[in-house]
Amino acid sequence: ELLSTVKSDERNYKAVQYGMYLVANSANGTAYSTFYDYPVAVAAKTGSAQRGEGSTANASFVCYAPYDDPQVAVAVVVEKGAAGSSIAVLAREVLDAYFSIQSSNESVDSEMTLLQ
């Protein structure tokens, strides 16, 4: 059930989407080292939340793919994970599982099924 929507000019959405594309596909992007050679175009955002002086930050990473026609979205949060760029590989593994299932015409039995 859709609870609400954000109303904004289409160019604002496009700017955010392109920024997320650059995170994974530009040499300066914080997730580039994880996705530069990925066969499907990915859009992503890395993040970290400080926990106080002397504590390791919590890490977050979100992405969707394919960039131009999204089929799947992944969110990863790791307590004391330091930085989103350091956990991007976990999202890549989820995408690997998803796209290998898609290419082999297998299906997941139900929502919330853990892919192994």
Region roles according to the model:
Residues 1-5, 11-105:
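Active-site beta-strand/loop architecture of penicillin-binding DD-peptidases
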Residues 105-116:
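Ligand-recognition elements built from short beta-strands and adjacent flexible loops
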